[in-house]
C-alpha cells in the first residue's frame, strides 16, 4: 500500500515536472517570438530611416536645384510672368524614386554618387525645365557621361532636288525623278537654300527641322511629292586654336576655339598668331575666317581677333576705342545679380586661373553680396539702337568669307556679329546654320551637393541686343546665323573656290 502511494506521488510529481517543462517551453517560444518581433521592428525602423535618409539627401539636391534656378537664371522672372512656375519638389522626388526602382530592376545602377543615381534624378529635373518651353541654348544639365541641352537645334536637311531661279520663280533642274524636271516650285521659299553646284548658283530643297525625318513633302505645281531627305553632316574636326595659311590672294584664319585660359600656352599661341594678321592680310582680296566647330568661350578673344583683322591694335588707345565700339553689340543686354552668382563667379575665376586682378575683384563682389539675399538686374536702361552700328574707321579691302556650321556657337556667333558691325556689306557666310546660342550668355555651372549633377544657368540676357535685332542673317535662338551659301559635307571647297577663285588656297586647305 505504501509502495502504491509512493508510486502515485512519483507519477504526480513527474506530471508536475512535465507541466513545468511545457510551460517553460511555451514561455521560451513567447520570448523568442517577442525577440523576433523586436528585431523585425528594428529592421523596419532602420529601413525606414535609411529610406528617409535617402529621400532627404535627394530632396536636398532638388531644393538646391530650385535655389540655383530661382536666383541664378536670368529668365526666371520672365518665365514666371508668362505662367506661374509650379516647382513641385515632392513630385520630382516621386519621379526620382520611380526611375531609381526601374533602373535598379534593369541593372542600370551606374553613375551613383552618395547613393543617388545621377540619371534617375536628371530626368525629372530636365522634364521640369523642358515643360517650361524655354528656347535657350545655354540651359542644360550634365552627368559624368552626358550633357542634356534643353533646346533642340534647328538643323537643315539636304535632298537631291536642285532648282534654278528664273524671273523670280524656281524650277526643278536636277532630280532623281526625271519626270518632275522643269516643274515650278510652289512650296515654302524658306525651304530652298542657295548652294554652289557644278560652278553655278542653284537652290536645293532643304527643310529646317528639329526632329529627324527621312522624308518630307515637296510642292511642285501645287502637287505634293514625298521625297527623301538627309541631315547634313558637319564632319569638320580641326581643333587648332589659331592657324594661318597665306596665298597670293587670300589669308585663311582657322579659329577653333575662344575657350582659352589666361596665361596658358594656348593664349600665348593665339596672341602670337593674331599679331601676324595685319601684315599678312595686306593686298589680299579675301580673308577666309573658319569658325566651324568653334563653340565659343571668353569674349576677350573674338574682340582681339576682330581688332587684329581690322588692324586696330597699333596702340592701346586704338584698341580701347575699338573695344568701346564693339561693346555696343551688347546694348540692350540685361544681367542678373545675386549672392549665388557672385560666389560662383569667384570660384570659377580661381578654377580657371584668371588674373589676380580679376580674382580679387570677384572676391570683393562675392563678399559684398554675401549677406544680400535680393536679386536685381542691371542694364535695363541700356536700350539697343534700332539699326546696326557701323564702324567709321579704317576699312579693309578684302572680302571676308566666314565658314560656319552647326557647332559654331555662343561667343563664336558673337564674333560674327562684331564683324557685321565693322562692315556688314563686306561679309559672305558659307556653310550650315550656326548653333543659335546667343539669347543668353555668361552661363554659370552649379554642382548639386550630393548627386554632383551639373546644372547650367545663364546670368545674362542678350535677347533684346542690337546683334539679335538688327542682323538679317540671324534667324533666332536654335536657328542661328543662316549662310549666304549653304554647303553639304562635300562641297565646301567648291564653294570657297567659286567665291575666291583661289586655286592655291583650295590645294593647301583640306576643307
Description of each model-found segment:
Residues 32-43:
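Sec-dependent N-terminal signal peptides
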Residues 15-27:
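Short, Lys/Arg-enriched N-terminal segments with co-localized hydrophobic residues
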Residues 465, 469-511:
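Low-complexity, Gly/Ser/Thr/Pro-rich intrinsically disordered linker/tail segments
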Residues 3, 10-17:
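Short hydrophobic targeting helices and cationic amphipathic motifs
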Residues 281-382, 420:
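Glycine- and acidic-residue-enriched helix-capping/beta->alpha junction motif
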Residues 24-31, 290:
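Positively charged n-region of N-terminal signal peptides that target proteins for export
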